[in-house]
Amino acid sequence: MALTTEQKSAILAEYGLHEKDTGSPEAQIALLSKRIADITEHLKKHKHDHHTRHGLMALIGRRKRLSKYLADKDIERYRALIERLGLRR
């Protein structure tokens, strides 16, 4: 369920601002989106796993706060990111 180092590296290479970027909002939102997608797939099989569902809601909230921060800081970067990730908003 956790992201492997290779998966993280691939996501950071695609969405990071530079090679070693792990802290930009774009990189963090992309990593959270991948984790959210993986957990959502897990919950489709294990419908009664309420502890994981609670953790999923926390991740969604964190992604929402980071998205709001990016939208307030630079709306063009925000729009480009949600287009690339295919997120609603």
Curated annotation (Swiss-Prot):
Keywords: Ribonucleoprotein, Ribosomal protein, RNA-binding, rRNA-binding. GO terms for biological process: translation. The keyword Ribosomal protein applies. One of its GO terms (molecular function) is structural constituent of ribosome. It holds the Pfam family Ribosomal_S15. The keyword RNA-binding applies. Signal peptide: none annotated. One of its GO terms (cellular component) is cytosolic small ribosomal subunit. One of the primary rRNA binding proteins, it binds directly to 16S rRNA where it helps nucleate assembly of the platform of the 30S subunit by binding and bridging several RNA helices of the 16S rRNA. Part of the 30S ribosomal subunit. Forms a bridge to the 50S subunit in the 70S ribosome, contacting the 23S rRNA. Belongs to the universal ribosomal protein uS15 family. This is Small ribosomal subunit protein uS15. It comes from Nocardia farcinica (strain IFM 10152).
